[in-house]
Regions:
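Short helix-capping/hinge motifs at transmembrane helix termini and TM-loop junctions
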Residues: 57-58, 103, 127-128
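Short amphipathic alpha-helical segments at helix-loop
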Residues: 30-33, 56, 79, 122-126, ...
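Acidic active-site catalytic centers that drive phospho-/nucleotidyl reactions
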Residues: 9, 49, 83, 91, ...
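Mobile beta-alpha loop/short-helix "lid" or hinge segments that flank ligand
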Residues: 15-21, 113-114, 130-132
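Short linear motifs at protein or domain termini
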Residues: 1-58, 63, 165-169
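Alpha-helix N-cap/N′ positions at the starts of helices
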Residues: 25, 48, 70, 133-136
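Conserved amphipathic alpha-helical segments that form helical-bundle/coiled-coil interaction surfaces
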Residues: 37, 41, 62-123, 136-143, ...
Length: 169
């Protein structure tokens, strides 16, 4: 028999991180995002994620680039299958795989907290208006990684994260 305490603790943690809301009656819901909140989250991503990518760049190697190419192919497959959850998971996996190389766990934890807050809204948006093709930003990120172009990498990551969230406004 499994105790409900771990579930309760997980729900409390997600609520503390802004991914869930708990009403006074105990009802649990994914909070809807206002335009102001979306803009704030987009600003945070635009600040933090290019920094993580930049810190990761000196530790990028061919095997990592190959892994990112594979993840990007999975993103294309998820879009073709109209698998919204698979698309979101693969997209976040692409970013997380790169950012882990930054060896900046505190910054990565902040970024993941931001992701938690907007994923339910993105899921609803993509279910209403599914993508027909993958955005080109990941390809730009990959090309900058291949040549070690740090300013280009920062720009590509910033464009990727801000344009993705701009769809929500």
């Amino acid at each position: 028999q499994v105790s409900v305490m771990p579930v309760r603790e997980a729900v409390r943690r997600l609520a503390a991180e802004g991914a869930l809301s708990i009403s006074s009656s105990g009802r649990i819901v994914a909070p809807s995002l206002t335009n102001e909140k979306i803009e704030e989250l987009a600003s945070l991503r635009a600040l933090l994620e290019p920094e993580l990518a930049s810190k990761a760049l000196p530790r990028v190697h061919n095997a990592l680039i190959d892994k990112l190419v594979l993840i990007n192919s999975t993103i294309d497959q998820m879009i073709a299958k109209k698998d919204v959850i698979g698309y979101i998971k693969s997209n976040l996996d692409f970013h997380r795989t790169l950012y882990l190389r930054a060896q900046a766990p505190i910054t990565l934890a902040l970024v993941e907290t931001v992701w938690l807050q907007f994923v339910p809204t993105i899921r609803a948006l993509y279910e209403d208006t599914p993508r027909s093709q993958a955005p080109n930003y990941h390809r730009k990120i990959l090309s900058t990684l291949r040549v070690g172009d740090e300013p280009g990498l920062r720009l590509a990551v910033r464009a990727d994260v801000t344009n993705g969230l701009r769809m929500l406004l």
